[in-house]
Design a protein with these regions (language model features):
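Soluble catalytic domains of enzymes that build or remodel membrane lipids, polysaccharides, and related
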Residues: 45-200
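Alpha-helical transmembrane signal-anchor/signal-peptide segments
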Residues: 28-44
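Short, functional N-terminal and low-complexity linear motifs
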Residues: 4-6, 16-18, 37-41, 70-74, ...
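Non-catalytic terminal accessory segments
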Residues: 1-30
Length: 200
């Protein structure tokens, strides 16, 4: 009947479309693209080469070895500063991968350092026993590898520009914590200097 034929046709179309959709999703999730921006400002900051990345979701996308290779590629860009704006790890990142990735970050050579602010996945949604480490353990490992962790903090770099690292919104919305407003974070800053905001 026509009804059965149209159901079969819908099934024949739905299955390949689903496969294509999942394949494209996997490809986009597992590959990294470089996007370059040049910003011009009247502020007296001079030239600054910033490399920023987010949403690596180590363990879901690639593991520690893959992340370390990407850090080698970032090093070739000769950044003045590296900014990691959240979801570096998530609930499926093993402790071994987390440590290996923090060590890879610690090997980066930059003029002004590496800075990290939290995303909604970094501290984990489950009990720390699920992945073998807590948000505090992640902070300790990052800091051990000379990564500066910013949680509603502002840093003046070389008297040239500011970096503001915001607490993730999930801290306030899902975990009952506090997140400072931009007004609070910028009220004492010199407006003649360039400001970079890290906000997942």
């Amino acid at each position: 009947s026509k009804k059965q034929a149209s159901k079969c046709l819908a099934g024949f179309i739905a299955v390949p479309l689903t496969v294509v959709y999942l394949a494209v999703g996997w490809y986009l999730c597992s590959n990294v693209w470089e996007t370059d921006y040049t910003l011009k400002t009247d502020k007296k900051s001079g030239d600054i080469r910033i490399v920023q990345f987010a949403d690596s979701h180590v363990g879901t996308t690639f593991h520690g070895d893959g992340f370390a290779k990407y850090m080698e590629e970032i090093q070739k860009l000769d950044p003045d500063v590296v900014l990691i704006t959240g979801d570096f790890v998530d609930d499926d990142t093993s402790k071994e991968d987390m440590i290996q990735c923090c060590e890879a970050l610690g090997k980066l050579k930059t003029k002004y350092g590496v800075y990290f602010s939290f995303g909604n996945h970094d501290k984990g949604y489950y009990d720390p026993s699920y992945r073998g480490y807590s948000g505090d353990d992640l902070i300790a490992e990052l800091e051990k590898n000379n990564v500066n962790v910013l949680q509603d903090d502002t840093v003046l770099i070389d008297d040239r520009f500011y970096i503001i690292g915001r607490q993730d919104r999930s801290e306030e919305m899902e975990k009952g914590g506090h997140r400072a407003s931009m007004e609070e974070l910028t009220k004492d800053l010199d407006s003649s200097k360039f400001t970079v905001v890290m906000d997942h």
